[in-house]
Amino acid sequence: MERLKRAAAIHDISGFGKCSLTVALPIISAMGIEVSVIPTAVLSTHTGGFTGFTYRDLTGDMRPIAEHWKSLGIKFDAIYSGFLGSVEQIDIVTDFIDDFKEKDTVVLVDPAMADGGKMYTVFDMDFAKQMTRLCAKADIIVPNFTEAAFMLGEEYRPAPYSKEYVESTLRRLSCLGPSKVVLTGVAFDGRQVGSASYDRSTDEISYALSDTVDGYFHGTGDVFASALLGAYMNGLSLAESASIAVDYTHGCIVRTKEAGTDLRYGVDFEHGIPDLLRQTGII
């Protein structure tokens, strides 16, 4: 039996409302990857649609956790960062990558900071510049079009997009440092939405689209990125991994919509895990 590959996941924890670590940990673990976590904050719920939530910042614990792991000689096959709440946390993750990235370690950064043409209310445009610095350390980044525009210093353009714009954006993002870029929210019309992937080593661009489902579904970016990383760590190409992640995320959304679940609660990723494992070739 081969040893399990190991990923470090650096995200916040929302006790209720499936997103961030409560999505990344089960999905990546189910795909046969051992997951070690550095929690950046603990919240009673995520912040999208809930009020009165509790929040405990864990910035002060992040470096001591990393230092303890370093003293134990722990190594990682992947490092995966998601929502980071401050420039200080970006600095900590940057140092973590410097300390733990080895020749074959895959670094995936989800620059979660903006959507719908706006920065999240807790951030300003300087944060986008700092996130760009972190993305330069990554092998793979998974921005949406708002995050892509802000990292490139451009104005946000809403969908629909042309292939020329999508492919230009992919290549320009790769020039920031990462050799692989997966853009989410790709839509050429109102009927389908998905991702576009670019691998600089092969100059290959690929698309993965699924039928549009009306509504705003919390946590789907975390579901997508977690499935993408899990597939990639299981030996699939970037294009194959993105296609699987789009299909899986779409299934999660459809099940949630059909069940009539409160959309604030997150999507039903659990029932789709067997199909995800079959698609990935794990079972």
PLM features: what roles do these ranges have?
Residues 15, 205-218:
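Short pre-catalytic strand/loop immediately N-terminal to key active-site residues, enriched for Gly-Thr
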